[in-house]
């Protein structure tokens, strides 16, 4: 089954939420729908991002998983952008 990544650019946190709560929540949301392979925090162009790698049978399902994660994460933090990539050999190709 193909591997995908959702990269969620994180903005302001909801009052009372600590920064270390964002990544576990993003991974939990993805895990509600599919198998989580890995999770990581990255700084991309100065913006903190929660990155969750997961399995999905198609691009359409991967996009739905990413949308679910972004919508659910809005209760924890502002989601500035969402990007979905698919593993193609040794490269990650943009899906959404």
Model-derived features with residue positions:
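Long, contiguous binding/interaction regions
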Residues: 1-96
């Amino acid at each position: 089954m193909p591997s995908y990544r959702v990269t969620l650019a994180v903005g302001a946190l909801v009052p009372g939420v600590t920064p270390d709560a964002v990544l576990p929540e993003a991974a939990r949301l993805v895990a509600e729908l599919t198998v989580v392979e890995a999770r990581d925090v990255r700084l991309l162009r100065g913006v903190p991002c929660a990155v969750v790698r997961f399995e999905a049978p198609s691009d359409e399902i991967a996009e739905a998983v990413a949308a679910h994660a972004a919508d659910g994460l809005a209760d924890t933090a502002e989601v500035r952008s969402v990007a979905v990539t698919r593993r193609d050999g040794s490269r990650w190709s943009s899906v959404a």
